[in-house]
């Protein structure tokens, strides 16, 4: 009886030991990630698990636990870093726990229900809690990785993409005068070239920003920059105006995704104390793009000797060389971007724990090697990942034909982008989105509107000065003459020309009014801004001229002949003073941004984003009133430089605030929407301010000042993100 009792006691103790060991191992594996997040920065060793286990283990006298005898049989890559006593090496990656762990076990009373039994509201609540925990942990991880070689390498790669965006904004304005003559652009269609690029950038910003939240920052940026580079390069070779417009539209569509994706990408590898300053330094590349475009235009476009032709049908002039050179920053960014990893913050957001861990370890090791500390170990081995909520259904391979599957896939992705965009107006970011919309619209409307108004005013002042130098010839008579020189800036009124020959003459800004031409010959004549108003031509021969019908206004022809008229569009024989002046003014205006960039970068984390945003916009609005005193070209250029220098701080702080206010799952989408709104406001500002150039100064000044001050006051009401972790 006593032996039977001892056997039962020994059996019960053995069963209890086995159950206790199974329970402890399960609890230890489930809670290991939480313990690591709490202890990794205290450098505590995880051998404490074994020590605690040993204190609680019970083995009957004379018996020992032999469950470790076959441990090697269950080893795998996921368990590397464990010794025979199951001690975890510091910094060794343990792999992400299975999402199905514990799901298939028996559900006891009081056990939490599985995801399949929860409604969407519960799942979203759990996801928000996971995201908050991840945000705090990710900030600690980025701080451990440090700021060094990796961030600087990514800084220059993304800077090239941002530089390409700056070039795209300037390139159309620089090539427009030459492209108008080379592509036979009518006056009614010249405005389309500037607007079509902004239209493409507006659509592209929204699309690529949304795609970056779906497929990743790197992939979206690679695709959009490739689209921009390809069509920008192609536009330099097309001959027709329609094809040129299409190429610039698609080029703008591609580059539209650069700004929202670049800032989202770079912000996600920066620690909180570095974010404001280094995002501001990144903004400097946009200015560098403007300087690059201005300098290249100044150096290339006026040099017609760089041109070549292949027959009369294909003309490759210097402005096309300029377009190719402007595509180089985009090509460079695409090549360099292929060597950079995806944003680890995005990967964690979509549940790709292992890939994110490897990239974070790469960042840590790269920075530590650059510091001369290669022995320093990356101590993180578990990172919180938000609960994934399936929204879209994967398309099966047998769903109709290939093009139907492609169409359904595109439609599904677009619908997903739209859903993400609508979530930008949900709690808790709805109020911030509305305020940011107002600030982005007002700043863009005022900045781009006045940016167009300044050059037009300078051009208007130049025209007034040019008109004062006009030579007026009235009621005179010339007979039996021959002219073979250039005639410029003249008005001939009530003149009579009898038996005259115009041989190889270049007419530049010449107008003939109420004049009579008898038995005259125009041979090999070219003209720019030259018109015949209410003139009479009798027995006159026009041979090899570029006189189009629109140059004869209310004129009469009697027994006249037009032979071998020049075909195609003739390159203007301007002395290039105006071209040099335009490039020089843009160069100075862009260079004036440099001090503002430096100041904003140094003070962004000291005085705060909101103070800089509101203060810069209010000061820019006040500076508009100095335009009352701009009565000369030099004074207007000075005002332009002052205005650009003040507004750049507002742009930099607005970029930083926008990135920090949106969570990771909709950061690029929200930024893309606001950037698209920015382009729409720019087009509206160009139209309104451009129509007021020759009317009055009062309306543009008051309109720009009011808009900027109101936007600055709204910007001061945004939340301060200086001490906030990136959600």
From Swiss-Prot:
Gene: Sv2c
Keyword set, alphabetical order: Cytoplasmic vesicle, Glycoprotein, Membrane, Neurotransmitter transport, Phosphoprotein, Receptor, Synapse, Transmembrane, Transmembrane helix, Transport
Extracellular side: 176-191, 248, 302-320, 459-578, 631-636, 694-697
Glycosylation sites: 480, 484, 534, 559, 565
Cell compartment(s), UniProt: Cytoplasmic vesicle, Secretory vesicle, Synaptic vesicle membrane
The UniProt record lists the keyword Phosphoprotein: yes
Region (Disordered) location: 22-120
Family the entry assigns: Belongs to the major facilitator superfamily.
Description of how the protein assembles with itself and partners: Interacts with SYT1 in a calcium-dependent manner.
Its membrane topology: Multi-pass membrane protein
A GO cellular-component term linked to this record: dopaminergic synapse
Region ((Microbial infection) C.botulinum neurotoxin type A-binding): 529-566
GO molecular function, one term: transmembrane transporter activity
Stretches in topological domain Cytoplasmic: 1-154, 213-226, 270-280, 342-437, 600-609, 658-670, 717-727
Tissue: Expressed at high levels in very few brain areas including the striatum, midbrain and hindbrain, and in the olfactory bulb. Expressed at lower levels in cerebrum, hippocampus and cerebellum (at protein level). Mainly expressed in brain; also detected in lung, liver, kidney.
InterPro entries xref list: LD_SV2 (IPR055415), MFS (IPR011701), MFS_dom (IPR020846), MFS_sugar_transport-like (IPR005828), MFS_trans_sf (IPR036259), Sugar_transporter_CS (IPR005829), SV2 (IPR022308)
Transmembrane portions of the chain: 155-175, 192-212, 227-247, 249-269, 281-301, 321-341, 438-458, 579-599, 610-630, 637-657, 671-693, 698-716
Modified residues (Phosphoserine): 75-76
Species annotation: Rattus norvegicus
Positions of modified residues (Phosphotyrosine): 466
Gene3D superfamilies: E3 ubiquitin-protein ligase SopA, MFS general substrate transporter like domains
Region (Interaction with SYT1): 1-57
Name of the protein in question: Synaptic vesicle glycoprotein 2C
BP GO terms, sorted: chemical synaptic transmission; neurotransmitter transport; regulation of synaptic vesicle exocytosis
Stored Pfam families: LD_SV2 (PF23894), MFS_1 (PF07690), Sugar_tr (PF00083)
PTM statement from Swiss-Prot or TrEMBL: N-glycosylated.
Function comment: Plays a role in the control of regulated secretion in neural and endocrine cells, enhancing selectively low-frequency neurotransmission. Positively regulates vesicle fusion by maintaining the readily releasable pool of secretory vesicles. (Microbial infection) Receptor for C.botulinum neurotoxin type A (BoNT/A, botA); the toxin binds Sv2c via extracellular loop 4. Restores uptake of BoNT/A in rat cells that are deleted for SV2 receptor.
